[in-house]
């Protein structure tokens, strides 16, 4: 339970919420979320967005939500965090071990392939294009 929140679906966006939505968009591509929509996002009084209902993830495909973010500059904080994570073998190993306790090996391997592919795109270019996102289909 997250107190003092409401459904985000009908709220207008601002700079702070748009940055968060871009990060959620990338996260959803990496975990292959097939059910992200405004109805499973909630927002608090400080404009902090929470992605809820993540049950349809790590599946055979992802939903192509938030198409307006293709080719837009992604937040510097996301680029920095992805760069740091991908440069840290120990952190990746720990995450892999934890995921292996919860998911089949093939899904964990696909997750890391998507993470590395998307992460490198973002680090190198700061954006993801629609064509590049279509490449994710080969990582499932």
PLM segments and residue spans:
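Phosphate/dinucleotide-binding and metal-coordinating scaffold of catalytic cores
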Residues: 1-140
């Amino acid at each position: 339970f997250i107190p003092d929140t409401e459904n985000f679906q009908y709220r207008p966006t601002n700079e702070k919420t748009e940055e968060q939505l871009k990060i959620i968009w990338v996260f959803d591509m990496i975990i292959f979320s097939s059910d992200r929509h405004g109805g499973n996002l909630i927002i608090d009084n400080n404009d902090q967005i929470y992605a809820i209902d993540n049950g349809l993830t790590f599946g055979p495909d992802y939903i192509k939500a938030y198409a307006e973010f293709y080719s837009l500059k992604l937040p510097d904080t996301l680029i920095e965090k992805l760069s740091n994570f991908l440069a840290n073998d120990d952190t990746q190993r720990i995450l892999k071990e934890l995921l292996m306790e919860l998911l089949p090996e093939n899904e964990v391997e696909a997750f890391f392939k998507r993470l590395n592919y998307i992460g490198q795109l973002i680090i190198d270019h700061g954006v993801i294009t629609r064509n590049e996102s279509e490449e994710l289909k080969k990582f499932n």
